[in-house]
Swiss-Prot record:
GO biological process: one example: fatty acid biosynthetic process
Compartments reported by the entry: Cytoplasm
Catalytic activity: apo-[ACP] + CoA = holo-[ACP] + adenosine 3',5'-bisphosphate + H(+)
Entry keywords, A to Z: Cytoplasm, Fatty acid biosynthesis, Fatty acid metabolism, Lipid biosynthesis, Lipid metabolism, Magnesium, Metal-binding, Transferase
Any one Pfam family match given in the protein's UniProt record, by short name: ACPS
Phylogenetic lineage: Bacteria, Pseudomonadati, Pseudomonadota, Alphaproteobacteria, Hyphomicrobiales
Gene Ontology MF terms in the entry: holo-[acyl-carrier-protein] synthase activity; magnesium ion binding
Full protein name: Holo-[acyl-carrier-protein] synthase
Protein family (similarity comment): Belongs to the P-Pant transferase superfamily. AcpS family.
Recorded superkingdom: Bacteria
UniProt GO cellular component terms: cytoplasm
Amino acid sequence: MIIGLGNDMIDIRRIEKILIRHSSRFIQRIFTDIEQNKSENFPKRSYAYAKRFAAKEACAKALGTGIAYGVNWRDIGIVNSPSGKPTIKLTNHAQIQLEKLLPSNHDAFIHLSMTDDFPWAQAFVIIEALPRG
């Protein structure tokens, strides 16, 4: 069953401006080390950061909190499976919020889709609860 759904869209040019003005502070406050390494090695780093920013916003919406109630930007990490598929790893308050949404005897699966088409970056998140066993 679907227990959370979120989407977000951001103007890549907004992220480009922030990276020029507040690069280090913005990156350290918002993105995990894994996200930073992935984005810094991307040919168009502003595109990579914008997609990950949109994914974090979409996930926060799917959790029903937004970036509030103790959920921090870095509690929502965008990671890749061994096959390269993007997904989300939650920690701290984001993980606690997810556990509150889960029915008993269910496990959560987070589905993520990210895309960009200049000047837009967009992400969709579906949180699914599946019965154990």
